[in-house]
Regions:
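Conserved alpha-helical elements of sugar-nucleotide-dependent glycosyltransferases
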Residues: 15, 190, 247
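Residue-level signature of the cytosolic catalytic core of signaling kinases
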Residues: 49, 143, 183-187, 244, ...
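A glycine/serine/threonine-rich, flexible loop-to-helix segment
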Residues: 129, 185-193
Length: 313
């Protein structure tokens, strides 16, 4: 397979850094653009001595200038956890709008392919279960989650507009809940939050009854699916996630057992617009990409808990 020069925005984040590692190991050259608003320098430090890796510190809402040819532009930059996009609501909207416009403009100027990292949040609090790519969603545009949900929905619309009117070769991946090593303990996502509370002998905080469900995909499976989408010719959105569903209450119990810790659970009021269920229909990924997750959830959880135990909290 031909070696590509890839520009990856948000490459210092959790997903972006795993994808950078994967692409470098495949023999591609990767230029990461990140402003560290939520990404971390330590996530990309392991690549600093790799001749195929380049880093540019920049806000992608500003014009992006890259010297030389580019084969693929991957737009992963965005605050993605509730804590982050509630803290940076304007930046979240700007990176979804201006950041997507600038990265699409780069792809257009370089005659490069383009992939947008979208999200299951475009489905909002779904009234259809599981969610397939034809479902338009159930989103409150002015609710607290709206800044992220609508930023990604706009980014998808802009991507398809560039595909149709500028003939840009585009891809859209709708990423469902993903977990694994290198997650920030303070990013507000449920798995690192529960692990941190458990390892610190703090009570585990469950919002609502804990009967609400999520589906969690291990990060190596996600990256593998994204790469298959990159190499495909499919331009419509594709769900990538693990359809294995688990309640938040069961998740807390599993983390306690995995960490060999006694747990105390504290219930708090459910946040506004928090979805009751989230589960991907991955029929398209199976049929178009021949992709399905390989890592069993409990195995991935064990690897993640052990990583957190090996790194200071």
């Amino acid at each position: 397979m031909e070696k590509m020069r890839i520009v990856l925005t948000g490459g210092a984040g959790f997903l972006g850094s795993h994808l950078t590692d994967f692409l470098l190991k495949k023999g591609h050259s990767v230029t990461v653009i990140d402003n560290f608003i939520t990404g971390r320098r330590e996530n990309i430090e392991p690549f600093s001595n790799d001749a195929a890796f380049t880093f540019i510190r920049q806000d992608v809402t500003k014009h992006i200038n890259i010297e030389g040819g580019v084969d693929f532009v991957l737009h992963f930059a965005s605050p993605a956890s509730p804590i982050d996009y509630l803290k940076f609501p304007i930046q979240t909207l700007k990176v979804g709008a201006l950041g997507t416009l600038n990265t699409l403009g780069l792809a257009k100027a370089k005659h490069a392919r383009f992939l947008l990292a979208s999200t299951s949040e475009v489905y909002g609090d779904p009234e259809v279960h599981p969610q397939n790519e034809d479902y338009w969603g159930h989103v409150n545009p002015i609710g607290p989650r709206g800044v992220y949900d609508e930023a990604k929905r706009f980014a998808e619309a802009l991507t398809m507009a560039y595909h149709k009117f500028h003939n840009i070769d585009t891809r859209i991946v709708r990423i469902f809940n993903t977990f694994g090593p290198h997650m920030r303990k303070d990013d507000g996502r449920v798995i690192p939050t529960f692990i941190g509370q458990c390892l610190n002998d703090e009570p585990i905080t469950i919002f609502g009854t804990g009967e609400q469900t999520r589906s969690f995909c291990f990060v190596s499976d996600l990256v593998r699916g994204i790469y298959r989408l990159m190499l495909s010719n499919y331009c419509n959105p594709v769900n990538i996630g693990n359809p294995e569903e688990i309640s938040i209450k069961t998740l807390a119990e599993l983390i306690g057992r995995t960490a060999n810790k006694k747990m105390r659970i504290v219930h708090k009021e459910l946040p506004e617009d928090d979805p009751q269920c989230r589960k991907p229909d991955i029929t398209t990924a199976k049929n178009v990409l021949s992709w399905s997750p390989k890592i069993v959830f409990r195995d991935g959880l064990d690897m993640t808990v052990r990583w957190f135990m090996d790194h200071s909290l």
